């Protein structure tokens, strides 16, 4: 009962502070169907422009070799052939397994460490300087060392992704934990909530949007670095597919690999947004009660 008493009033307060986004959307007059149509038109224009430039280069201006800029329909046919042969699925599975392992480890470490440092000033002063020293170093700078330390197998790729994905999650988590509205914490404390109840029912829910943002950034970065890792030491994966196609000037194959990475990134972003909506469903419920 105490937890419920803490959760509902505080949820109403948080909901009130986040109620401006729908208003912004209504002022712009952009409903969900309108947004979907605009996005579809944008994609259509992109493919039409791509097709037009490819066609003009191949048959009119001939600025460079037409093989270097295949038309969208040619890339689509190549992708369908690769999918039918099972080659594309093999590369997708290899990259996804590496990304999910590295991203999962990074998410666990980033959320736990970020939460611990956000809740403890002592730990923050002890640990954060070391992490801040490592954070500006580009992940690619550590790739050769990862290969030397862990070999050319899966361990080096997973460790590389873990390192790259850790910092976005850690940074957004610690910021979300540290900068929770103190009014919410005082409101929960005035209702008799314990420190544990305040953390689970106030601090963590309030920090969840930051954490989800970090997860989205980290997942995109995970695919960025796995492609680089698969350029160097791999016999499968989307990075290997792109690099192997580059060697033989198979531009359509390269674009298929790049397109698949883009599609996976979009799907992951949608799933993480759905997860955020489920985790924060209490906000909309509280807004309705308010």
Please name every model-derived segment.
Residues 1-44, 270-290:
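Transmembrane alpha-helical segments of polytopic membrane transport and secretion proteins
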Residues 23-29, 56-104:
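Periplasmic/extracellular loop-to-transmembrane helix junction in inner-membrane transport proteins
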Residues 34-60:
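N-terminal signal-anchor transmembrane alpha helix
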Residues 101-131:
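Transmembrane-helix boundary motif in ABC transporter permease subunits
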Residues 129, 172-214, 238, 242:
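Short cytoplasmic-facing helical segments at TM-TM junctions of multi-pass membrane proteins
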Residues 132-168, 175-176:
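Generic hydrophobic transmembrane alpha-helix motif, especially the helices
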Residues 159, 163, 195-228, 252, ...:
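Transmembrane alpha-helices
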Residues 238-274:
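Hydrophobic alpha-helical transmembrane segments of polytopic membrane proteins
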């Amino acid at each position: 009962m105490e937890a419920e008493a803490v959760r509902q009033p505080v949820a109403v307060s948080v909901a009130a502070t986040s109620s401006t986004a729908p208003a912004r959307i209504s002022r712009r007059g952009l409903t969900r169907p309108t947004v979907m149509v605009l996005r579809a038109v944008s994609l259509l224009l992109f493919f039409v422009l791509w097709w037009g430039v490819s066609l003009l280069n191949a048959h009119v201006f001939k600025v460079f070799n037409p093989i270097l800029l295949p038309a969208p329909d040619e890339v689509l046919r190549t992708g369908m052939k690769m999918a039918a042969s099972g080659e594309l699925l093999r590369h997708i599975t290899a990259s996804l397994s590496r990304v999910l392992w590295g991203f999962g480890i990074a998410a666990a470490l980033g959320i736990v460490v970020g939460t611990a440092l956000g809740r403890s000033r002592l730990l923050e002063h002890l640990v954060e300087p070391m992490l801040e020293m490592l954070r500006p170093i580009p992940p690619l700078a550590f790739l050769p060392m990862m290969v030397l330390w862990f070999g050319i197998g899966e361990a080096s790729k997973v460790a590389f992704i873990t390192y790259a994905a850790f910092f976005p999650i850690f940074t957004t988590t610690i910021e979300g934990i540290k900068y929770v509205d103190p009014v919410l914490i005082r409101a929960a404390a005035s209702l008799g909530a314990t420190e544990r109840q305040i953390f689970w029912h106030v601090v963590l829910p309030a920090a969840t949007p930051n954490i989800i943002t970090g997860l989205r950034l980290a997942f995109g970065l995970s695919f960025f670095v796995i492609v680089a890792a698969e350029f160097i030491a791999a016999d499968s994966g989307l990075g290997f597919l792109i690099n192997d196609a580059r060697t033989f000037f198979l531009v359509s194959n390269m674009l298929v690999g790049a397109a698949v990475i883009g599609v996976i990134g979009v799907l992951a972003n949608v799933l993480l947004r759905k997860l955020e909506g489920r985790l924060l469903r209490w906000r909309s419920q509280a807004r309705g009660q308010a």
